[in-house]
Amino acid sequence: LIAFHGQSGDIMFQGAKTNKVQDAFDALNELGFDLGGAGPAVRTSMSCVGAARCEQSCYDESRAHRQVINTFLDDIHRPALPYKFKFKFSGCANDCMNSIQRADMAVIGTWRDNMRSDEGLARKWFAKHGMNELVNDVVARCPTKAIMLKEVKELRTGDAAAHLTSVKVSDTHALEIDNKDCVRCMHCVNVMTGALAHGTDTGATILIGGKRTLKIGDLMGTVVVPFMPLKSDEDYEALV
């Protein structure tokens, strides 16, 4: 019986007799398949589709995934750790891999410069959705109150606006985003995709220790590296 196993992405062979497991293991190895990934070992890791097709991707997830897994491949085959260990790679804070609460080491895409904006798309969005949705679903839901709705004439300019992202939604009103207060949660980008976008100085945040248990619930990972650039070969090598 073969089962494709959910979050781990493994093919599981269930119901084998104990005295035949090693024979099956050896035979599949000879065919070129990797085996292992269960018990107190490095588990099968996962990365989102990311850079292959998603505009929100902040680094090359599959490359980072391969770099890390190739380094620790031997630890996947046989249980050799005190407890299981999982790596997961998400390209942005939407965290499609659930890495923040389902991985011992999570690599989540982020950026450290100002957000980008597109006035044409912002005006189209506003014309379609209106003021109520802009206020209730964008401005009011910013977790750090980094977004303000202003009249165009009140927008800050010059050196005082170096840390701001401003975009007109109409001839009279505009959004002003204080990038110093932004926590890169992706909510406004998700709601106004295209009109707002992540910055160009991208990389990843690395977290340790996320897990999910029935007794306690989600325990989010702890940030150990707030920002790591992931652009050059040296950057990806630094992951390991």
Predicted regions and their residues:
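Small-residue-enriched alpha-helical segments and adjacent helix-cap loops
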Residues: 1-135, 141, 145, 155-159, ...
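Non-catalytic, well-ordered alpha-helical scaffold segments
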Residues: 22, 201-203, 237
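Short coil/turn segments at secondary-structure junctions
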Residues: 52-56, 226-227, 231
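A structural signal for small-residue-enriched, beta-sheet-centric alpha/beta enzyme cores
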Residues: 116, 128, 136-139, 143-144, ...
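Short helix-start
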Residues: 151
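Long, compositionally biased charged/polar accessory segments in the mid-to-C-terminal portions
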Residues: 232-236, 240
